[in-house]
């Protein structure tokens, strides 16, 4: 199978690139994720896909949310501008008749990062901390997708039963504590609320209040990793996403892990493919599926 067109639909951006047979990304570009509903998302996808219809052999899509039966649904619709249900496969097929494979973005990233590890680990997990919190799981060298595409939605495991209400409708999910959205929300009580990116900039400059907010996020991730270690006997965790890859975040997660008994700790490292794990993983997965 020749070149593929990979797309990564996230809460803030949609990235696209041609992926060669050797796994090289060519012509990568991205746009902001539309916030205006299904019509705008469909138009954005056509803008990104149409120029490549006669240049590639297949289309591979990694997307935030639940991918099942060709549809994209969201546990937390706020992560997609309120979009709760979208006929993703049919939309893409209306743009191009090329073979198309869909996968959750955390699952796709996990597959790419698992390949990058080589044949070293049977059980690993990818964690993305970004607009939301998600992930993908490899068990016994196989990607766990699930009957309904739900596997890896670790951001909706419990962090604080008395915490804020998550966009999924449950109270105290990890996502509602640790995500970039949650970090930004923590500043609403400040004299001047700021974005998650600004919180990280402030922490880098030694701002104690900003550091405390980031530490709370990192601690929630560390506790979630402890739970996943005990449930899945993980050998390694790969950290990605805009927050997960922010300067100093990995070190804060590791520091939070060190407060736990040794059995609950798991090695954590940054994503080898950085922000492109989802793009590459979708293409790699498509090659095994088509």
From Swiss-Prot:
<feature type="binding site">
    <location>
        <begin position="6"/>
        <end position="13"/>
    </location>
    <ligand>
        <name>ATP</name>
    </ligand>
</feature>
<dbReference type="InterPro" id="IPR023945">
    <property type="entry name" value="ManNAc_kinase_bac"/>
</dbReference>
<dbReference type="GO" id="GO:0019262">
    <property type="term" value="P:N-acetylneuraminate catabolic process"/>
</dbReference>
<feature type="binding site">
    <location>
        <begin position="132"/>
        <end position="139"/>
    </location>
    <ligand>
        <name>ATP</name>
    </ligand>
</feature>
<dbReference type="GO" id="GO:0008270">
    <property type="term" value="F:zinc ion binding"/>
</dbReference>
<dbReference type="GO" id="GO:0005524">
    <property type="term" value="F:ATP binding"/>
</dbReference>
<dbReference type="GO" id="GO:0009384">
    <property type="term" value="F:N-acylmannosamine kinase activity"/>
</dbReference>
<keyword id="KW-0808">Transferase</keyword>
<keyword id="KW-0119">Carbohydrate metabolism</keyword>
<feature type="binding site">
    <location>
        <position position="168"/>
    </location>
    <ligand>
        <name>Zn(2+)</name>
    </ligand>
</feature>
<comment type="pathway">
    <text>Amino-sugar metabolism; N-acetylneuraminate degradation; D-fructose 6-phosphate from N-acetylneuraminate: step 2/5.</text>
</comment>
<dbReference type="InterPro" id="IPR049874">
    <property type="entry name" value="ROK_cs"/>
</dbReference>
<keyword id="KW-0067">ATP-binding</keyword>
<keyword id="KW-0547">Nucleotide-binding</keyword>
<protein>
    <recommendedName>
        <fullName>N-acetylmannosamine kinase</fullName>
        <ecNumber>2.7.1.60</ecNumber>
    </recommendedName>
</protein>
<keyword id="KW-0862">Zinc</keyword>
<keyword id="KW-0479">Metal-binding</keyword>
<feature type="binding site">
    <location>
        <position position="166"/>
    </location>
    <ligand>
        <name>Zn(2+)</name>
    </ligand>
</feature>
<dbReference type="Pfam" id="PF00480">
    <property type="entry name" value="ROK"/>
</dbReference>
<dbReference type="InterPro" id="IPR000600">
    <property type="entry name" value="ROK"/>
</dbReference>
<comment type="subunit">
    <text>Homodimer.</text>
</comment>
<keyword id="KW-0418">Kinase</keyword>
<feature type="binding site">
    <location>
        <position position="156"/>
    </location>
    <ligand>
        <name>Zn(2+)</name>
    </ligand>
</feature>
<dbReference type="InterPro" id="IPR043129">
    <property type="entry name" value="ATPase_NBD"/>
</dbReference>
<feature type="binding site">
    <location>
        <position position="173"/>
    </location>
    <ligand>
        <name>Zn(2+)</name>
    </ligand>
</feature>
<comment type="similarity">
    <text>Belongs to the ROK (NagC/XylR) family. NanK subfamily.</text>
</comment>
<comment type="function">
    <text>Catalyzes the phosphorylation of N-acetylmannosamine (ManNAc) to ManNAc-6-P.</text>
</comment>
